[in-house]
């Protein structure tokens, strides 16, 4: 009887295991991911054209390659309206160009060039040349009406816009932080910054009529107030912030 009992238990376990695993052998898919259809992306693009609270971020380590999409703009959340490319915005290869083009065409997500503005020619002065040599900057005088420096500023601003045109970016994000270690001959001179922004504003920003964005981040509350109408967005960074009320105060003072 003991032997029969053991056999009965083993047989019962065998059947329960067999029937318990039978669902694994089903050949028909019962629950699987479906990619969004054309209507989803059309609605997403249309939504981003409406007046709404935008989603923004900085995007670094961009390659446009990799199965995980962590280094691709296509891997960004669908709700992101625009991003500022940090560090790897220049000399775009086909992978990054294709990634940027696809995310804009499919999701309506836009990409901006972004870097710190401190000195004339930052990020664009050719290697081996000085700002004085390449841009015609006169470092001997910071007079607001110095014709050499005003011309150098115009040349620099237009070079930024030329870069935007070359790679089909959607605008420029000025990282402006004069009170956090980045005060220079350009960023520390209100007259020069206003001339710089006005020159940019002829080709990008709300006054240009091009649809390309001009954005300022970091310390927009510190920029010369006359420049305000030339920007699409002000982005306040939380350096030394004490809380939401402090950030609101900074924004309201722009």
Regions found by a protein language model. Give the residues of each.
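Bacterial Sec-dependent N-terminal signal peptides
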Residues: 1-8, 12-51
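Chitinase-like catalytic core of GlcNAc-active glycosidases
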Residues: 51-254
